[in-house]
Amino acid sequence: MKTIFLGLIHIYQRFISPLTPATCRFYPTCSEYTREAIVVYGPFKGTWLGIKRISKCHPLHKGGFDPVPLKKTKHKKDKNINK
């Protein structure tokens, strides 16, 4: 499933995006952000993050640097720490 989503983004970036004017207000671009989000979080959460990002990409938003959020890691508590 992840491969399909990434493939669709690749097709967009390779064949559709070059035909349109560069209007993305963010770095990385919205399509690159969505691609990175899918790689990090999987197809469903990554696509959701991409949709949220694209919804902010309009003239009333200032744009700027907006990277994919880091994935939170769960730390295991070391039970031997106080011994």
From Swiss-Prot:
The keyword Metal-binding does not apply. It is found in: Cell membrane. It is a peripheral membrane protein. GO terms for cellular component: plasma membrane. It comes from the Bacteria. Its main location: membrane. Keywords: Cell membrane, Membrane. The keyword Acetylation does not apply. Could be involved in insertion of integral membrane proteins into the membrane. Belongs to the UPF0161 family. This is Putative membrane protein insertion efficiency factor. It comes from Staphylococcus saprophyticus subsp. saprophyticus (strain ATCC 15305 / DSM 20229 / NCIMB 8711 / NCTC 7292 / S-41).
